[in-house]
Amino acid sequence: MKIINMKKISILIFVICFMGALKAQQLPQITQYMNNNYAINPAVAGMYDYYQINSTIRNQWAGLNEGPRTSIISIYGKHNSNVGLGGTVYSDVTGPTSRMGGSASYTYAFPITQKIKLALALQAGFTQFKIIKNLRAEYENDPFLKGGDVVEALPDATFGVNLSGNNWYIGAAIPQLLSSELKLMDDDFARIYDTTSQNGKLASHIYILGAYTYDINSQISIEPSFFLKSVAGVKTQIDFGIKSEYKKLIWAGINYKMNNELSSMAALFGYNINDRFNLGYSYGIPSSMTSNYYSGSHEFLLGVRLPH
């Protein structure tokens, strides 16, 4: 019975934290946003003259049992001179809670000047939330442990805008545009555990993302970038990054994340193969406050450029 109670407490903590996260940054986090910007803003699909497939796998708290694990696969690119198309599927798992979804996007781009282009995008799809209750209770009347998994599926949408030039871009996106209401706890759970609300809301976020590529010479370039994330009631989070590329073959960079009172840093490395494949890796360095609990974060990216 002691084991069951410990598992029960563990699940309860995850659920309460999960519901609490509905008031904070709710969406999967990635470090290599500059290499997978479509996962942030669907409007960038109109910025490229080719189709790209990106796959990202992230283990956010390595060494911590049942820490966040994220997988994202995206395909996007220019369909014709004005239209960009794209699609994404993803999975985000933390302990007994999971979030998965899929979406497709349509982007329309048009020139502002000879060198500057504006793109507008609408992305639509679904999101499924799940709490796994795979425990057996000794007492049949246990209101939380009895019954099956909790599953809730909701429609989702994102609006994006992107302004781009030859070597720069800046854009904004509003994910979770519909602000759908989410119910993961039944009435018995809410009553017995005295939760203040059994409902959560998928709050609309505001993302602003930009980058500029500067060629130092014919072999070396640098790319500073930033990624701002904002949601009502939560302090704005800002990521600053810079990467340097040599002969368009290998690159390295750093990313600095400012999040409330807790900041963090990540090191990034990558390799481009024949202008068709690119590999990326980032290591999130744990802060002095968290190093006793986990050994950092690992994120891998594989990109494939398709011939148009």
Where are these regions (language model features)?
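Positively charged n-region of N-terminal signal peptides that target proteins for export
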Residues: 1-9, 112-114
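A detector of low-complexity, intrinsically disordered, Ser/Thr/Gly/Pro/Ala-rich segments
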Residues: 1-4, 14, 55
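Sec-dependent N-terminal signal peptides
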Residues: 9-19
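Subset of outer-membrane beta-barrel
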Residues: 25-308
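Sec/Tat signal peptide C-region and signal peptidase I cleavage site
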Residues: 18-26
